Amino acid sequence: KVALLTDAQMTIPILIVLSVWKGLGYKIIILLAALQGVDERYVKAGRMDGAGSFRRICYIILPILRPTILFLSVTSLIGAFKIFDEVYIMYGQKPGPLQSGLTIVYYIFDKFYRHWEFTTASAAAFLLFLVILFFTLLQFLFSSERRKS
């Protein structure tokens, strides 16, 4: 056994580091593809207008990348709520020491497959859907307000 995995206070930081590491490659590839799609003429025009590197990034490149950043933030948010594999692989039958790694998806799995409490699992899954929907709509709302200004 790994000593870090038996410490209840280290469960959440370990899960965060593992989840970030797991999804970082995908997000970097998506951002690099979006950066390659930025037309060089915009950057050259900003350079000709006297904009420095920081201003070109803030006022030219980031607004062009805004849809990609919104996509990545929405998928990251959904992925953050759906953490199950990491907990199940690292801790097996229990969600960590003192149930310190209990996530909503692990709770749904436990209620549905181990305790056969189908109604509780369905209610928890529906609540998870509502929470994800709320935060996704909130992100779209903030994104559309930033576009207007």
Map each language-model feature to its residues.
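Intracellular coupling helices
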Residues: 29-69, 147-149
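The feature captures the transmembrane alpha-helix scaffold of multi-pass secondary transporters
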Residues: 9-16, 26, 30, 57, ...
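A short glycine-centered flexible hinge/capping loop motif at secondary-structure junctions
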Residues: 49-51, 95, 118
